[in-house]
Amino acid sequence: MKKQIAILGSTGSIGTQALQVIEEHPDLYEVYALTANNRVDLLVEQARKFMPEAVVIANEEKYLQLKEALSDLPVKVYAGADALSQIVESQPIDIVLASMVGYAGLRPTINAIKAGKAIALANKETLVVAGELINALANQYHTPVLPVDSEHSAIFQCLEINNRLEKVILTASGGPFRTYTMEQLQTVTKAQALKHPNWEMGAKITIDSASMMNKGFEVIEAKWLFGMRPEQIEVVVHPQSVIHSMVQFEDGAVKAQLGMPDMRLPIQYAFSYPERVKSSFERLDFARITDLTFEQPDTKRFRNLALAYEALYRAGNMPCIVNAANEVVVDAFLKDKISFLGMSDVIEQTMGKVAYIKEPTYEDYVDTDAEARRVALSLLSS
């Protein structure tokens, strides 16, 4: 029986690579639903190739265009946030790949968990914003949440039953500005920030990687995926991106997962878990690896990592505040409305201006997200 897969964000970097995995294993996987935010042309192309049961476009203004383009196919067409959240509940679906960008992925992921679907989680913001809620729901509905982030997939693959962890070690490439001085960071452009040295990703996550907010979010994500305390989660800069992450056990032994910097590998493992499936992806050639280096991250130059740790220690709705402010400032940076270093200033100020809630409900997260965005936008315009 083929696994039926719904891909939330099929036109993005993770979504398109997931379709490559499915295409390589047509005997194992079948696309049930594809969703996108705005990119109608690519969604149509994907629908014609993979023939899903349904497609959803989040932007309701694009519905008629999508409907017309697929009028000759027996594919159901839906639009809007409600449709996006409802499609994941469809009975045939086995796995939901949550690869939408940002806060928008929270509600459909919650609905998928409640519907008992296995979650292949690429949308780290879902756990950043509401990790405690997601974990509680996953336990309540007995729903597996499998990491797709390369670092968390690496940790997941290194874990051993009944062997207690001392800490997890997340590796970071350091991004394009790893060796830049503070003076150089003051004048970097979005064009420079969008050139990641090792990974091909979408614009938002590429900027997050350059600012190290992406690594900060992964620290928060690791807390909820693996039940770690903040002080048990270490970040080490590893420019070669060959070691994807490590775990250290109480006896001092360390296990690492190595591989090419190719997101199709963790995507495929999330789809096939607990089995491993043969792939044609490029193999690691140790004879060509000249060095593997490590260094401590500089949180003075890359303050976002320190802000993420602070949010994790404070807990409650603080990570939600950081995520919302970050989405606002990254959008502003991509529109040349704020400097690279200025992003951290706005995030930190937003953390101090939005009301703190120690034990937030889902409604509190919704309100916090809206208020943090309002505050961050007002700081940008002041």
UniProtKB/Swiss-Prot annotation:
Reaction(s) this enzyme catalyzes, per UniProt: 2-C-methyl-D-erythritol 4-phosphate + NADP(+) = 1-deoxy-D-xylulose 5-phosphate + NADPH + H(+)
Top-rank EC class of the record's enzyme: oxidoreductase
A Gene Ontology biological process term: isopentenyl diphosphate biosynthetic process, methylerythritol 4-phosphate pathway involved in terpenoid biosynthetic process
EC identifiers of the protein: 1.1.1.267
GO MF, one example: 1-deoxy-D-xylulose-5-phosphate reductoisomerase activity
Domain of life: Bacteria
Keyword entries, A-Z: Isoprene biosynthesis, Manganese, Metal-binding, NADP, Oxidoreductase
Known pathway: Isoprenoid biosynthesis; isopentenyl diphosphate biosynthesis via DXP pathway; isopentenyl diphosphate from 1-deoxy-D-xylulose 5-phosphate: step 1/6
InterPro entries for the chain: DXP_reductoisomerase, DXP_reductoisomerase_C, DXP_reductoisomerase_N, DXPR_C, DXPR_C_sf, NAD(P)-bd_dom_sf
Binding positions (1-deoxy-D-xylulose 5-phosphate): 124, 150-151, 173, 196, 209, 214-215, 218
Keyword check for Metal-binding: yes
Cofactor(s), names only, from the UniProt record: Mg(2+); Mn(2+)
Binding, NADPH: 11-14, 123, 125, 202
Binding site for Mn(2+): 149, 151, 218
PANTHER family from the UniProt entry: 1-DEOXY-D-XYLULOSE 5-PHOSPHATE REDUCTOISOMERASE, 1-DEOXY-D-XYLULOSE 5-PHOSPHATE REDUCTOISOMERASE, CHLOROPLASTIC
Function: Catalyzes the NADPH-dependent rearrangement and reduction of 1-deoxy-D-xylulose-5-phosphate (DXP) to 2-C-methyl-D-erythritol 4-phosphate (MEP).
Entry's family note: Belongs to the DXR family.
Stated name of the protein: 1-deoxy-D-xylulose 5-phosphate reductoisomerase
Organism, scientific name: Phocaeicola vulgatus (strain ATCC 8482 / DSM 1447 / JCM 5826 / CCUG 4940 / NBRC 14291 / NCTC 11154) (Bacteroides vulgatus)
